[in-house]
């Protein structure tokens, strides 16, 4: 199983995604979306180079698309550290700076 750790800011991102999902799509769909995110986090932890280079925002940063969100992460000795999970419509530079 791929090791991953979430930044405190990413934990807030996920809470907000979950709340938005409940309000707009219902509890079941929101839960499924968050479960899918966590499954992808594990996969990325096992395959750290799966994402694309995102070093234009921060050195060694990588990104991977999940449905309508972009996951930004850094490789660690044991897997990955997930910095942010942002909606694709957001200004990444503003939220990663």
Task: Describe the residue ranges of each PLM region.
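Arg/Lys-rich, positively charged N-terminal/basic patches that mediate binding to nucleic acids
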Residues: 1-32
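Short proline/glycine- and basic residue-enriched helix-capping loop/turn segments at helix->loop/beta transitions
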Residues: 42-46
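Basic/aromatic recognition patch in beta-strand/loop cores that engages polyanionic ligands
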Residues: 49-79
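Enriched for short, Lys/Arg-rich terminal
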Residues: 69-97
């Amino acid at each position: 199983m791929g090791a991953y750790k979430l930044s405190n800011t990413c934990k807030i991102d996920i809470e907000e995604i979950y709340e938005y999902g409940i309000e707009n799509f219902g509890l079941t769909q929101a839960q499924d979306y968050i479960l899918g995110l966590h499954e992808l986090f594990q996969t990325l932890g096992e395959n750290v180079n799966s994402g694309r280079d995102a070093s234009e925002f921060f050195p060694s940063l990588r990104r991977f698309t999940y449905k309508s969100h972009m996951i930004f992460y850094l490789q660690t000795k044991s897997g990955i550290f997930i910095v942010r999970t942002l909606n694709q419509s957001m200004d990444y530079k503003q939220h990663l700076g």
